[in-house]
Amino acid sequence: MTNRLVLSGTVCRTPLRKVSPSGIPHCQFVLEHRSVQEEAGFHRQAWCQMPVIVSGHENQAITHSITVGSSITVQGFISCYKAKNGLSKMVLHAEQIELIDSGD
């Protein structure tokens, strides 16, 4: 089964960094995406806020460069988890992160 997602956007919540009891570092943040997409010959506004989690030592160096307002592209897979309120929430598990140069 294929489960791949590539999403570009702007970090809209302060990254939360934690280390699990087993010593695995995690970084969580929310990525906001806004674009215009074509569907059935019409242009449509696309918008979402996607929770992202980055786990493991491999990507932790780049997570320290991520702040609110950072423009990034994230590649990974999606999964659901049950929130404290009992509702299912989708999250993007990042496997690759690229900072987008703002051109400044």
UniProtKB/Swiss-Prot annotation:
Cellular component annotations (GO), alphabetically ordered: primosome complex
InterPro entries the record matches: NA-bd_OB-fold, Primosome_PriB/ssb, Prisomal_replication_PriB
SSB domain: residues covered: 1-101
Keyword DNA-binding recorded: yes
Taxonomic superkingdom: Bacteria
A Pfam short name: SSB_1
GO molecular function: single-stranded DNA binding
Keyword tags: DNA replication, DNA-binding, Primosome
Gene Ontology biological-process entries: DNA replication, synthesis of primer
NCBIfam families cross-referenced by the UniProt entry: PriB_gamma
Record's function text: Involved in the restart of stalled replication forks, which reloads the replicative helicase on sites other than the origin of replication; the PriA-PriB pathway is the major replication restart pathway. During primosome assembly it facilitates complex formation between PriA and DnaT on DNA; stabilizes PriA on DNA. Stimulates the DNA unwinding activity of PriA helicase.
Membership in a protein family: Belongs to the PriB family.
Oligomeric and partner information: Homodimer. Interacts with PriA and DnaT. Component of the replication restart primosome. Primosome assembly occurs via a 'hand-off' mechanism. PriA binds to replication forks, subsequently PriB then DnaT bind; DnaT then displaces ssDNA to generate the helicase loading substrate.
Name of the protein in question: Replication restart protein PriB
Species: Shigella dysenteriae serotype 1 (strain Sd197)
Name of the encoding gene: priB
